[in-house]
Amino acid sequence: MTPALHLEILDLRHFSASYLKPVLEAESRVWDQRLRWDFHASASLLLQYLDSRLLPGYVAIENGRICGYVFCVYESEKALVGDVFAVPSVTNPQSAADVERRLLEHMIELLQHSPGVDRIESQLLLRPHGTHTETLRNAGFQIYERLFMELDLNSASLAGGPEGGSTDGLELRTWRDNDFSAAGHLIAQAYEGHLDGIINDQYRSVAGSLRFLHNIVRFPGCGLFDPSASRVLAYRGREEIAALLLCSRVREDVGHVTQICVSRKYRRRGLGAWLLADCSRALRLSGFQALTLTVTRENTDAVALYHRSGFVTRQTFDAMVWERRGGVRV
C-alpha cells in the first residue's frame, strides 16, 4: 500500500446509490476504453440494488470521498464476487490496484468466515492477469488465466462450415425461447469433466446450467441478449440441441459470445467455426464492428479455434475459485 494512502473500509449497505454513482461512471469509462463494453445497463441495475441496502460488500473512502467498492451475491452455499473497482488516480495509477486489494481482502475475509459459504467464485475482467495474485493465493484461491479476445468484423473473412461427417440431420437457426431446456441439458453434458466446470460450478448440472442461461438471457450483466445473432444447431424434428452459440450486445456496435458449446458427438467437425462465422455475418450485416469472447488459456483447443477464426487477445484476466476444505462439492 502506498504510504500516503489512508483508507476507511466501510459496509456498502450504509450508502445509497447516489454516493456510488461517480465511481460507477468512472468504471463505465474504463469498461468502454479497455473492453469496448457499454457498462451503463449493468451500472443502472447495480444502483437499484444499492438503494435497496441489501447488497453485501464494502466501499473504500479516502479523504471523505468514496474511491472504490466491492460487492458479492449469494447462491446457496456459493458466493460470487461480482465486481471490485477503484477509481484510477492520475498522479498514482498504482493506487487503484492497492485500493482494490484492500477491498478484496475485506470481502474474502468476510466470506471465508461465513459458515454458510463453502465456495467463492469471481472473474475480474478489468484487471490484467496477475494483478491480485498474491492476495488471492494467500487466501487459498486457485487462479486461472483467461483471455478476452476480439474479432474485427470489418476485416474478418467469416468463412466457416461443417467439416467431415454428416450434419444432414441438423438445422442451423436462431435462438428460440423454447430452447431453454434443451440448451441446459447440452451445456451440462458438454462441460462434464471440463476445466470451465471448475471455474463455474453452474456448468456441472442441468439445474445450474438453466440458472446460467436465465442470467444470460434475462439480465444485462453480460450485455443485452440478442436472439437474432444467437445460433442453435438443432436436430430436425426433435427438441434436442447439438450445438449453440449465445450472443449479447455489449455496445451498440459490439457483440459478445456468452456461451458456445458443441455436443461431444459432433466435435471436431468444424461446427464451432460454423457457429462463429454465421453469428459474425449476422452481426456485420446489422452494422456491428466487433465480436468479443472470453476463454480459459488452458482450453487450448478453443483458443486455437478462435485464433483460426481471426480473434486476437485484447486483455488477459483472472478467474478465481476457493472451496472450503470439507465443504460440499458437486
Sequence positions of predicted segments:
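Conserved beta-strand-loop-alpha-helix junction that forms the acyl-donor binding cleft
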Residues: 120-131, 264, 293-303, 320-326
